[in-house]
Amino acid sequence: MAGHSKWANTKHRKAAQDAKRGKIFTKIIRELVTAARLGGGDPASNPRLRAAVDKALSNNMTRDTLNRAIARGVGGDEDANMETIIYEGYGPGGTAVMVECLSDNRNRTVAEVRHAFTKTGGNLGTDGSVSYLFSKKGVISFEKGDEDTIMEAALEAGAEDVVTYDDGAIDVYTAWEEMGAVRDALEAAGLKADAAEVSMIPSTKADMDAETAPKLLRLIDMLEDCDDVQEVYHNGEISDEVAATL
């Protein structure tokens, strides 16, 4: 299955994202702690924790830092009051946006999320307003690789789909609970992924033009700058031509 490269949609934001690495680590640690607290410290029997571990390793977090976070969660700590909250809304150009948060103060979090939507011409919706457009999946990514080899190994390991992109990148889609097992099987076959994460995959895309694309990117940046926001999912599609103008 061929598709438009997601790397083209994100490469122009790489520098800004690299600058946020410290904040990304903080958010990953918070997810590791929460996942371990809720489901135990063994990634093999805790899919949420395994997904967090895979994300931590994909972002080059050390095993020592990772293990300390898990130990904090198992032992109970100051993050015990954290809860997962999902906000839904519409961004620039009618994009569907889902915002996953970990928060100990709902009032603070919703105020920050609503502010980001309002400042960029979007609006915060009600529960269920856009979530029906997304499916929770595991995504195992290869920047380059042999399509036939990866596809054969992935499907043999239980993957649901394999998507190839114009620039040679390949994504393997799995049931989110099975992502860790599929990644292990791929590595056992000599195929080391560049990234693995649980994501919300949209069923439809909204094409962004030169006017709406910068507004969408600003919304994403504002949301990601919120300490309580863990992940931002959207169905905006930015073409190579539009990305080149940003």
Swiss-Prot record:
InterPro entries linked: Integrase-like_N, TACO1_YebC-like_2nd/3rd_dom, TACO1_YebC_N, Transcrip_reg_TACO1-like, Transcrip_reg_TACO1-like_dom3, YebC-like
One Gene Ontology CC term in the entry: cytosol
Domain of life: Bacteria
Single annotated GO MF: DNA binding
GO biological processes: regulation of DNA-templated transcription
Stretches of the chain forming a coiled coil according to its record: none
Localization: Cytoplasm
Keywords for this protein: Cytoplasm, DNA-binding, Transcription, Transcription regulation
PANTHER family the record matches: TRANSCRIPTIONAL REGULATORY PROTEIN YEBC-RELATED (PTHR12532:SF6), TRANSLATIONAL ACTIVATOR OF CYTOCHROME C OXIDASE 1 (PTHR12532)
Family of the protein in this entry: Belongs to the TACO1 family.
Protein name: Probable transcriptional regulatory protein KPN78578_23430
